[in-house]
Every structure is written in structure tokens, then in C-alpha cells.
């Protein structure tokens, strides 16, 4: 990755994949019918981190791409890729927000059986779909950004990104 923007998005992808790995571990240890102790330090930290990630990382990451990068990519002829990524963003953000909404009450009251079953299903759907999305962006979007952005535009976008974080 040559541009600051591509490197920053790559780093955000790595952080997202690390969070997804923690979520997958939790889901793998507990069947949909037998939820975890939400007061255990690891589970409590994951539930907190999920809410924070949706509000402060995933949503803003998608918004930055859609407002600052995708119009430039469309102008450069990458409209099909952009259309696919925008569609995935909408689906992924809805899943992530659902998961965060299910995690919030569990942080203080634990998981009721039906709430855990819904959390488990939403978590499983999100981990698979978001990991596949990250792969697409790593293989298609980031190289396209490197090819598209000159140093001046990269610097200007880096300033915008820093202000949004």
C-alpha cells in the first residue's frame, strides 16, 4: 500500500478482523441455546468493544469511503465495484447495528435465552459477511485507491479522515 489512505483503511480492516475473531471465538464456545456469562471480563469487554466499533469505527469507515473515495472511483470507471461495496455497506451496517443493539442490554443484564439466540445468529451472519467484505476491499478497493490518488489528494483525504476520527 502506497497511499496514507490505503494504509489507514488497511489498519482499520485489521482491527475489524481482530474483533471478528474474538466474536467468532465466543460464538464457537457457546451454542445458540446456551449463552455465556456476560459478566466475565472477556465477554464484557467484547460486548463493550462491539458497541464502540459499530459507532466509532465501522459506520465512520463506511461513510468515509462512500463520501470521499467512491465518487472518485466512479469517475475513474470503477462504478461496478463501488455499487457492490455500497450495497454491502448497507447490509453490513444493519447487521452490525443489530448486533450492537443486542449487546447493549446484555452488558448490564446478561443474555436471556432468546436474546442470546438472536445475538448468536446476528454475530454469525456478521462475521462471515464482514470478513468477506474486508477481503474484497483489500483485493480491489485498496489497490484502486493506490492507483487513483496522487500525493496531494492523499494528503488532503488524510486530513479529512483524521478530522472525522
Name these PLM-found stretches.
Residues 1-165:
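Small-residue-biased structural context
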Amino acid at each position: 500500500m502506497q497511499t496514507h489512505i490505503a494504509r489507514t483503511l488497511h489498519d482499520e480492516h485489521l482491527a475489524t478482523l481482530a474483533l471478528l475473531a474474538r466474536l467468532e471465538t465466543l460464538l464457537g464456545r457457546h451454542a445458540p441455546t446456551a449463552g455465556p456469562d456476560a459478566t466475565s471480563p472477556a465477554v464484557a469487554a467484547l460486548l463493550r468493544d462491539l458497541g464502540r466499533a459499530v459507532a466509532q469505527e465501522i459506520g465512520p469507515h463506511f461513510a468515509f469511503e462512500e463520501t470521499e473515495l467512491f465518487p472518485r472511483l466512479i469517475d475513474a470507471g470503477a462504478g461496478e465495484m463501488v455499487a457492490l461495496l455500497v450495497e454491502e455497506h448497507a447490509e453490513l451496517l444493519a447487521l452490525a447495528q443489530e448486533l450492537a443493539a443486542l449487546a447493549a442490554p446484555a452488558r448490564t443484564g446478561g443474555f436471556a435465552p432468546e436474546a442470546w439466540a438472536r445475538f448468536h445468529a446476528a454475530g454469525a451472519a456478521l462475521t462471515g459477511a464482514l470478513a468477506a467484505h474486508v477481503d474484497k476491499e483489500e483485493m480491489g478497493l485498496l489497490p484502486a485507491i493506490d492507483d487513483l490518488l496522487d500525493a496531494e489528494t492523499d494528503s488532503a483525504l488524510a486530513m479529512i479522515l483524521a478530522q472525522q476520527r
